[in-house]
Amino acid sequence: MSQAAKTAVVAWLLAAVYYFYQYTLRSAPGVMIPQLSEAFGLTALGVASLVGLFYYGYSPFSLVAGAAIDRLGAKRVIPIGAAAVGIGALLFGSGSQEAASVGRVIQGAGGVFALVGAVYIATTHFPPSRAATLIGATQMFGMSGGSAGQFVVGPLISGGMNWQLFWTTMGIVGLVISVVLYLFLPKEESARAVGHGVKDTVRAFSGVFRNPQSILCGMIAGLLFVPTTIFDMIWGVRYLQEARGFEYVDAVIRSSMIPVGWIIGCPLLGAISDRIGRRKPVIIGGAVMLLVSMAWALYGKTDLFPPYIVGIVAGIASGAAMLPYTVIKEANRPEWSGTATGVVNFLNFTFSALLGPVFGWILQSVSGGAERELSHYQMTFEPLLYGVALAIVLAMFLRETGTKGAVAGRQKPEK
């Protein structure tokens, strides 16, 4: 392995570790809703709304992150994002509802630089034939953090760890990660074929947004992500406790199986896609499997399959949501890689930002503010199934960008 290749691997691994950390903080509030409710004097719905503020920073700053990395390079930008996540964690653990709200938004704004940065490194420093595999592996790190945020943090909190101590500790960890990123990310050459002015940035955004394939990628990814970001990470534990009757620890473990499935599915589906040289069949196949498993999670019996199987299968299938990140990169100009990733991330998590409060409000309405039952959750989250079905239909309109796709069917990069 050449020195340049080793440097690229180290850079990608560091960004992936940062993504792991960010995802841990993204999912951790889901296992401490009772503690947060007591600390802030909020209902479970109020805490869910506060936690959902993450996406109000994450979604719009996807555009900022992509453009900034294209213009300035990874070394100048990614460490700032990690520092922001650390500061946001410290604010969240301050005990003040106002500071926690601001901190949650800052966590989202800083956290987006992890995925965009890691994908940027994967798509600019490695061969195109490895793109889907590396992007899937990146999400594997993220979902490992998401699983840790439930599977590891849950027992810590239930075992007596103070929730403020957790957030303070993680805030310090974020600042340390920022320093490590700054010290070890390589400085990029300034000779990349991309401009550095405002006009060039606007041109990149215009080119990516005007490409219909970009919009399709964002919508498909968003519809496939929502079952995880809203149903599992915010309401999963409560659903399993209130609607299915599981004890807290068992509910946490079962809920964390979806991120565990992502850990398997993201690199697996990415590798399959690279292996067969096609994107669409893997996206559609994964989405169909997600639709079936989510329908079973809402309406099926809990004792028919071995424990944790449904969650793991849903998570594996959800890995298909990362393939649009590869497609959008292949459907646009190479020098717009960061911008394209930012755009698909923006469109993706706009779904989570907008729909999170909506699902919370619906659940509150159908339950009448009383004790929530299985039927209430089914009525509230059934639209997620329609969303996955819509993603399957939209995927049929994607143009194949894989290496073995028909030339006539490929989307030429926007010029």
Set out the residue ranges of the language-model regions.
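Extracytoplasmic
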Residues: 10-44, 231-237, 355-359
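Residue-level signature of mid-helix packing/kink "hotspots" within the transmembrane helices
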Residues: 27, 54-63, 146-147, 259-267, ...
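Extracytoplasmic gate region of multi-pass secondary transporters
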Residues: 29-30, 212-269, 352-360
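Conserved MFS/SLC helix-loop-helix module at the cytosolic interface between two early adjacent transmembrane helices
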Residues: 60-98
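Cytoplasmic membrane-interface "Motif A"-like loop-to-helix N-cap segments
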Residues: 71-82, 274-288
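Helix-loop-helix hairpin linking two adjacent transmembrane segments in secondary transporters
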Residues: 97, 138-186
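Cytoplasmic helix-loop-helix junction between adjacent transmembrane helices
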Residues: 103-142
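Flexible cytoplasmic inter-helical loops of multi-pass small-molecule transporters
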Residues: 182-204, 403-414
